[in-house]
Amino acid sequence: MMDVKTTTKLDNAVIDKLIELDESHLNKLNPYGLKKIGDKETYPKLDEIIEKFLEYHRGNVDGVFSWVKELNNLSKDLEGENISYDGNSANNHYGLPTHINGDYKNGLIYHCLFNAGTNGVEDSLKTNNCTLEEYYKIPEKDPKKGPKDINELISKDEELKDKIRNVRKNIIGTVSLLTKELINERNGAERGYYCKKYYQEILKKNTDFYFNPDVSDDDIAKATNNLVNIELYPLRSKNKKGAGYKINKFSLFGAYIILYRIGKYFNDVNSKPNIQKPKFIFRSFTEWEACIIAAIKNYFNFDDDNDKTAELFDYLYDNFFLEFSSPNAGSVSSVNVVKKVRIGNERFDKMTACLSDPQK
């Protein structure tokens, strides 16, 4: 499906190495302090940071809270570079991170973007001119600006444990942004940002399924969680320059997810030859390419072999990767998604069938 002809063939040793990057290996590369209790995944240290964040959000604590500093400290025992940032930008330090949303270990379509926005808050706003509490009150002065959606997320439940869970799932969770916004819309909310900006064609093609009152939210989610959202840079900024981005432990985790999922496909296709191949759609492809290449070099120990690195990346590009037609195109559609040429309606429909009514 949608593959281009390629003369590159992967060595069996490379395929085996991709398969070795299994769930257990991926969990060790998770920078958020993942702890497994049976089959349940927990993030106790991240939850402690979120609880601290909520105290600052309520204005109950003096001092300065910084997401970037908290995340760098959380991941201090993991090899790699810390998250870089642009000085004391309030967006970097106060804005709630968004990184991984969706069933990232089993997804079929991965929407890979650069970072989450700020809803109009300029990167020039500094922490020495604005407290975290004041930052989250920006929507009270201008309803069209600032983190209104995060305030709604925090106020959604009364219990602290529920608030912590909701915030954590915004940072890393198994429910996709398409699912979250679609379920909210089914329950009377306005259409969400990602559905309006990125998923109009998907919604249009699946209206009868998504908005059928006889279909449960859970059944909708089983389909729509096949779409996974990965941000390269977990912190927020209004503009890419305001991020001060460099490859770091968190961006590499996103790249390792991609390598893991491709390895899982190679492992599964041996016994299930007709399974759908995962596809990865990239915006800011230049930055993503550099990060994936860094992950390949790290994992395969290809530091001194650029030819092997390029050969593997080219194979992944030809067989698994898609781009948007321009830097400004972000909508996941038959017009905007390209594999050297636009993929067209038939191929787009085949790729996104996993998001549709399974009864059809």
Regions found by a protein language model. Name each.
Residues 113-116, 232, 282-288:
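Short, well-ordered beta-to-alpha junction loops that form the rim of enzyme active sites
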